[in-house]
Amino acid sequence: MGQKPKVAFICVHNSCRSQIAEALGKYLASDVFESYSAGTETVPQINQDAVRLIKQLYGIDMEQAQYSKLLNELPPVDIVITMG
């Protein structure tokens, strides 16, 4: 079987929407594609409401596994989804 496509979810600060998409992509579709997220700017920490809700709903601790990243920190990707 070939390599899974790499999907990047992109928003401005990489603090909420794209972080949620990356976490859910890893949780729900890791057998289909590799999930990444980034922003055009970064923030010191990801959105705490997003962290709380994803942990409450899916048991995923985004704060332990994810951080705000810039576009140039990602590996080459196959698909880009903007979440502006």
Q: What are the residue ranges of the model-derived segments?
A:
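Short polar/charged helix/loop
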Residues: 1-84
